[in-house]
C-alpha cells in the first residue's frame, strides 16, 4: 500500500485564514499555509492593506493586522484568484477608502455581478466593468445597513462575501442559498467570536461587537488536491493508497462519495474534530461503473473535471447535469473537458449545464482504443484543474499536456506526487 502525506494545504482555509486575520486586533498565526499562486495573492493583498507578515517557519506566518485597514496606493492584484477578489470585496465594502481589485485576463472575464448585487443590498458602493458583470471592481467603502438576501446560486464565495459585509453592517442580516455550499467561513468565523446562526437553512449574521479573536491555525491537506491522487489509485489496477491528514469537511468530500458509488473502495479514518474534521482516506482500485450526477453539485464542482477521467474508465454512458457554473471557472470547464475527449476520439456531448461521456472501461480497453489514433496534445486552457485531471490520465496513456505548470495555482507539488505514485505503483508498493 502507498501512504502519502501530500503536504498540499487546503486552499479554501489558507485564503480565509489570511483574510479573516484583518478583522482581528492581535497577531494571528497560520501554519502549513498553501504556497500556491492563488493563496499568495491573498497574502500580498493583506500586506498592501497594512498587515505585517513575518515568516515563522516553512510555509508558516505571523500576521499582525493593521489598527485600521490602509487605503492602498495601487490596484489590488488578485491574479487568477476568484476567492481573493470576491472575499476581499465583502471585507472592504465597509472599510473607509477607495479599493480597486483586478486580476489576470481569465479572472477579469469571470462573473462578478453575483457578488456585486448582494453587496449593493447592504448599500455598498461597488462598480464593475460592463454594467457590473466583470472586474476590475472599484469599491468606495463606507457604512452598511443589514439586509436579507436569497442567492440564486450556491456559492461559498458569494456567501462568504456577504458574511464579511454583514459582520460590519448595522443590524442582523440573513442569507439563504439554493443548496448548501462549503461552510468553512461560518465554521472559522464562529470559532473566532462571530455570531452566525443557521436557522432552518437561513444564516443569521450579527455585526461584530468586537474584533475577531486572534488565532493559531494549522491547515490540513486539501481534499480537492488529494482527489487527484485518489483518482490515480482508482484507475490503476491493483493499487491501494492512504492519503494522510486530509480535511474531511462533509461539504468537501462529495467527489470521494461519487467515486465510491462508481465502485472504488473508499474509507475515512477520522483523526480529529477540533475545528474541522481531519483524517485519512483509504482508496483501493476496483472496476468502475458509469454514473449520472445532477445533485450536490456545489459540493463537488471543482472535482468534476477529475471525475470525468474516472467516467472514461467506466463502461457505458456517464452524465453530469445542473453544473452550468462549470462554465464560469478559470476556463469553460464543460467545453474544455468535452473538446479534449473529442480530440481523443471519445464519444461525448456538451450540454449547457453539463456533458455526457461514453466510457470505454478499464485501462486495457483504453489502450486498445488509443492504439488506433495519433495522441493529440491535451489542452489545459491554462486551467489548473483541467491540466491535473488529464495529467492523471497519463498514468494509463502516453499523452502530453500543453501547460501542466498552471497546476502551481493550487497544487505546486502535483507533478512530484503524481510521479511518486506512478513509481511506487509500478514497483508494487
Swiss-Prot record:
The active site is at residue 302. 3-phosphoshikimate binds at residues 11-12, 16, 155, 157, 302, 329. Pathway: Metabolic intermediate biosynthesis; chorismate biosynthesis; chorismate from D-erythrose 4-phosphate and phosphoenolpyruvate: step 6/7. Its EC number is 2.5.1.19. Transmembrane segments: none annotated. Pfam families: EPSP_synthase. Phosphoenolpyruvate binds at residues 11, 82, 110, 157, 333, 385. It catalyses: 3-phosphoshikimate + phosphoenolpyruvate = 5-O-(1-carboxyvinyl)-3-phosphoshikimate + phosphate. It is found in: Cytoplasm. Keywords: Amino-acid biosynthesis, Aromatic amino acid biosynthesis, Cytoplasm, Transferase. GO terms for molecular function: 3-phosphoshikimate 1-carboxyvinyltransferase activity. Belongs to the EPSP synthase family. HAMAP family: EPSP_synth (MF_00210). This is 3-phosphoshikimate 1-carboxyvinyltransferase. The gene is aroA.
Amino acid at each position: 500500500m502507498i501512504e502519502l502525506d501530500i503536504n498540499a494545504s487546503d486552499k479554501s482555509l489558507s485564503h480565509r485564514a489570511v483574510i479573516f486575520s484583518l478583522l482581528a486586533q492581535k497577531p494571528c498565526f497560520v501554519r502549513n499555509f498553501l504556497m500556491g499562486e492563488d493563496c499568495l495573492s491573498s497574502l500580498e493583498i493583506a500586506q498592501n492593506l497594512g498587515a505585517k507578515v513575518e515568516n515563522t517557519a516553512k510555509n508558516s506566518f505571523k500576521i499582525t493586522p493593521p489598527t485600521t485597514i490602509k487605503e492602498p496606493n495601487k490596484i489590488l492584484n488578485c491574479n487568477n484568484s476568484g476567492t481573493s477578489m470576491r472575499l476581499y470585496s465583502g471585507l472592504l465594502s465597509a472599510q473607509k477608502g477607495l479599493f480597486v481589485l483586478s486580476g489576470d485576463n481569465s479572472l477579469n472575464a469571470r462573473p462578478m455581478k453575483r457578488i456585486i448585487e448582494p453587496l449593493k443590498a447592504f448599500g455598498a458602493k461597488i462598480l464593475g466593468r460592463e454594467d457590473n458583470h466583470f472586474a476590475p471592481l472599484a469599491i468606495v467603502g463606507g457604512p452598511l445597513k443589514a439586509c436579507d438576501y436569497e442567492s440564486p446560486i450556491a456559492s461559498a464565495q458569494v456567501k462568504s462575501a456577504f458574511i464579511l459585509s454583514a459582520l460590519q453592517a448595522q443590524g442582523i442580516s440573513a442569507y439563504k442559498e439554493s443548496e448548501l455550499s462549503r461552510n468553512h467561513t461560518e465554521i472559522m468565523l464562529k470559532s473566532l467570536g462571530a455570531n452566525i446562526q443557521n436557522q432552518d437553512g437561513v444564516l443569521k449574521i450579527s455585526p461584530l461587537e468586537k474584533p475577531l479573536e486572534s488565532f493559531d491555525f494549522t491547515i490540513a491537506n486539501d481534499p480537492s488536491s488529494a482527489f487527484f491522487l485518489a483518482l490515480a489509485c482508482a484507475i490503476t489496477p491493483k493499487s491501494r493508497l492512504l492519503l494522510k491528514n486530509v480535511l474531511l469537511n462533509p461539504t468537501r468530500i462529495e467527489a470521494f462519495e461519487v467515486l465510491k458509488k462508481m465502485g472504488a473502495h473508499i474509507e475515512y479514518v477520522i483523526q480529529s474534530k477540533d475545528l474541522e474534521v481531519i483524517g485519512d482516506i483509504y482508496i483501493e482500485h476496483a472496476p468502475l461503473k458509469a454514473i449520472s450526477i445532477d445533485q450536490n453539485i456545489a459540493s463537488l464542482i471543482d472535482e468534476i473535471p477529475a471525475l470525468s477521467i474516472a467516467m472514461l474508465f467506466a463502461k457505458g454512458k456517464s452524465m453530469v447535469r445542473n453544473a452550468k457554473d462549470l462554465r464560469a471557472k478559470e476556463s469553460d470547464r464543460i467545453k474544455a473537458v468535452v473538446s479534449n475527449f473529442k480530440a481523443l476520439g471519445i464519444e461525448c456531448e456538451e450540454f449547457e449545464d453539463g456533458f455526457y461521456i461514453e466510457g470505454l472501461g478499464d485501462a486495457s480497453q483504453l489502450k486498445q482504443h488509443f492504439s488506433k489514433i495519433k495522441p493529440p496534445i491535451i489542452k489545459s486552457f491554462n486551467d489548473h484543474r483541467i491540466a491535473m485531471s488529464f495529467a492523471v490520465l497519463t498514468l494509463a496513456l502516453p499523452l502530453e499536456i500543453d501547460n501542466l505548470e498552471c497546476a502551481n495555482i493550487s497544487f505546486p507539488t502535483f507533478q512530484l506526487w503524481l510521479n511518486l505514485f506512478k513509481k511506487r505503483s509500478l514497483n508494487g508498493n
